[in-house]
């Protein structure tokens, strides 16, 4: 298994990339960032990705996150980026543009991989749910270290409202929720989601957790609850780690070797 890889994290406002040490789950050198042409053509996004990749890394594979469902390297949904991405391959044209092996993965799944193999959920067996709280709500579900990809639990509907409409960053702004009101909604979503999956651990990450480091203390759920450990680097680290895994097969034994 290769010891380093490039992680590329595509967002609505920026594309971030860095070299990742796969034995530690840490960045090597600086994290580069370029503006994201999120609503532009596919070709412009690919060019921006190439601008974000550190120079002198041509021999390293790359993992690329995408804010939507990704199956077999192809995009099937798109959030905060142009809808023209839907139905478009990502891994193949990115590999051609970057001249290297590329693995494409849902952005929340990448953050989950980082937390399970290097962060707050490392070494935890059973069912682990990683929720990314940002503009929307992303999710990654793991069973005994194996990822169940593209769960999109932010679209679960409770009492006529999607989870994202209750407890995302966008919902908090649009509904003018104060902190207590937001905690009430988030607590509701977490407990209803827990009732469906009965996770042993829930990990919360994303921008909202960065703004409120004591968030976990304000929530009450019937399982262990932690904040993510990798914070803003989770997407990059998880994308890079995805290059060590077979396409569509998430093997815990390989993950443990990388996590030593």
Report residues per predicted region.
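Conserved NAD(P)H cofactor-binding loop of Rossmann-fold oxidoreductase domains
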Residues: 67
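ATP-binding/phosphotransfer module of carbohydrate and carboxylate kinases, centering on a glycine-rich
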Residues: 1-61, 70-74, 94-99, 114-130, ...
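A charged helix-plus-loop insertion that forms the helical arch/lid used to bind
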Residues: 75-87
């Amino acid at each position: 298994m290769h010891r380093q890889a490039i992680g590329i994290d595509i967002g609505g406002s920026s594309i971030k990339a860095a070299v990742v040490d796969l034995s530690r789950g840490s960045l090597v050198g600086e994290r580069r960032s370029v503006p994201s042409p999120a609503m532009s053509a596919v070709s412009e996004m690919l060019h921006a990705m190439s601008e974000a990749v550190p120079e002198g890394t041509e021999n390293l594979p790359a993992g690329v996150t995408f804010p939507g469902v990704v199956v077999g390297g192809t995009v099937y949904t798109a959030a905060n980026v142009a809808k023209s991405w839907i139905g478009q391959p990502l891994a193949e044209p990115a590999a051609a543009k970057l001249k290297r092996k590329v693995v494409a993965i849902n952005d929340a799944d990448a953050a989950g991989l980082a937390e399970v193999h290097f962060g707050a959920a490392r070494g935890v067996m059973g069912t682990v749910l990683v929720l990314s709280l940002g503009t929307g709500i992303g999710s990654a579900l793991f069973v005994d270290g194996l990822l169940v990809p593209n769960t999109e639990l932010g679209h679960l509907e409770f009492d006529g409202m999607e989870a994202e409409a209750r407890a995302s960053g966008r919902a908090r702004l649009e509904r003018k929720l104060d902190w207590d009101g937001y905690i009430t909604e988030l607590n509701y979503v977490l407990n209803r989601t827990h009732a469906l999956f009965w996770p042993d651990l829930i990990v919360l990450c994303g921008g909202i957790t960065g703004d409120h480091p004591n968030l976990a203390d304000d929530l009450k759920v019937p399982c262990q609850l932690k904040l993510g450990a990798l914070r803003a680097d989770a997407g990059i680290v998880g994308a890079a780690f995805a290059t060590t895994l077979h396409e569509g097969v998430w093997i815990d034994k390989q993950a443990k070797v990388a996590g030593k």
